[in-house]
């Protein structure tokens, strides 16, 4: 927490940028290339599309991180968005967190399970397509 407070003081900005990519947000270009880390996690041809989208998520995140690294103290990647893409998505979540930290940003892992509709939708999508329990208050 001390590091976050210091980062807020240094930037004079208490904002946190959420990194919650969805397929609708990322441009279709660049989905063809798979980086080594992602390629190694793909076990079947069916996972290629998810892996390509995961790489697009990373490029999208990297563009945002590069644009805001001098302006805000922290980013908050929402793990459900990445988990929905399977192993490649989890790898991209990790790569995103590492890249943000390398750029000097404080990384808040948004890994809660009782969350808003878009997160619940992504969790439901990959954990159990028929139903799932979530925060009863949400």
Predicted features along the sequence, with ranges:
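Active-site loop-to-helix "anion-binding N-cap" substructures in soluble metabolic enzymes
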Residues: 2-25, 29-138
